[in-house]
Structures are given as C-alpha cells and as structure tokens.
Amino acid sequence: MDKKTWVYIIIAIIIILLLVWYFRNHMSDQKGVNVNNQTYNMLQQQISSLNQQILFLKQQISNLHVPAPTSTVNSLRQTVSDINQQVSTINNQISSLNPYLPRNQQLELASVLSIFNRNALDLNNISRSVINRDINYFNAGQHGSQVPQNSHTVQNPNVADNELNVLQQKVDNLNGVVSNIRQHLAQFGSGIPESFRDEAEKAASYLNDRIDDINKNLPNLVQRLNPNQRNNLNRILSELNNDLSSLKNSLGSAVRNRINSVNIH
C-alpha cells in the first residue's frame, strides 16, 4: 500500500475511535440521567411520606391532654428521632444529587422541601413544651431556604443571611413556646393544677436554655448592624421580652426556674 492509503486508514481508525468514545460517553450520560431521575423520584416519595408523618404527629400532639403520660411522651420523642434520622439521610442524598439535577427539578425539589419545613415549624411550635424535642429541617439547596422565613426577618447585606435567619428562627421558636404555654394556662382559669407544674418547669428550663444561647451570640451580631436594623431587631426582641414577662407573671410561683430575658443591646 502506498503512503496515501495508510493516511486514509489512520484517519478511518481515528474516526472509529472517536465514534466509539462518543457513544460510550452518551450511553454513560444517559444511564446517569436515568439514575438521577430514579433517585429524584424516590426522594420525592420519601419526603411526601415524612410530610404525612408530620401532619399525623401534629394532630396527635394537638389532641393531647397536658401533662401527657410519660409513655406517650417517650413514644412521640422516639417518632421525632426517627423522622430526624430520615431527614439527615435525605439531606445527604440531596447534597450529592442536587448539582446534577436540571434547574426545574432543583426548583421543584426546593418547593417540596419548603412545604415540609413549614409543617415542621408549625409542629415544633405546638409540640416543644409537650415533648421538648424538635423536628429537624431540610436543606432546600441554593434555590430554597433551610427554614421558613418570617415577615419580620431582619435583612442586612453586610451580615451573613443565615446568621440573621437563624436568630429570627430562634425568636420565632421562643414565641411559639410562650404562646403554647399561655394557651394551656388559659384553660386552667385562676389556678394552676399540680399536674401541670412539672411540664411548666420543663418548659421554663427549655426557654432559659434557648434565651442563654441567644444572649451568647447576640453581641457579635449586633455590632455589624446599622442603626435602623438594630432598632428593628430591638423592637422584635422587646416584644419577645414582654411576652416572656407576661408568662413569668402568669406562672408566678408555679415554677422554681425564673424565666430569663433576652439582653437588648
């Protein structure tokens, strides 16, 4: 064979190798898409199932008579722990899968996770003083928020958004606990029964732990707020302190733990 024939043969071999490489990569990509779709659909089903568990748990706790029997409280706490374990597992799966999902699926997944988070927040607000255990939240990724946002959330471009959101979430949680306890107290009229004092004691201890956590981290955050933002934050904290003070007066001597206040800077 002459030199020209060898050139054609080499070119043909190169073309064949390129075609083989292309089809192998195409099939691999297609397989990856199928795996991602299967994982995505499985995640959707798992999250939907957890959402149903959340709603059922919320109904159970709403119907409880305080103080609930210890066996009931322990059972509910175990259910919450099981849900949190599943949330943790799914969060890890989302972290691995999310970068490979198309934008529309990322947005859809974030929406589903946000619905769960809102339901979890509602449940936490009514259940905290009963079982003293929180449902964890999903990470909704770059297209969603980890926790439901409140209309009073203070925004500051010079401070990390997650710091402010976490602080606001802590305040919202405290407001939810205070509101729940006051609703129970309203049912008792002028006197607080002995049967409720133990639960009130636990709630007061829980509130103080959360207030101490806020007080510990607040000074560093406040230093980075502008005057207007600081005023807004102080207003929110003042409202919280007023509610805490009112609850403290309502409980009176029913609890040994004195409920603390948030330090306003």
Curated annotation (Swiss-Prot):
Entry's Gene Ontology cellular component terms: host cell membrane; membrane; virion component
Residue stretches in coiled coil: 37-94, 158-257
The organism of origin for this protein: Acanthamoeba polyphaga mimivirus (APMV)
Transmembrane regions: 3-23
Positions of glycan attachment: 37, 125
Main location: host cell
The protein, known as: Uncharacterized protein R387
Localisation: Host membrane; Virion
Keywords: Coiled coil, Glycoprotein, Host membrane, Membrane, Signal-anchor, Transmembrane, Transmembrane helix, Virion
Membrane topology: Single-pass type II membrane protein
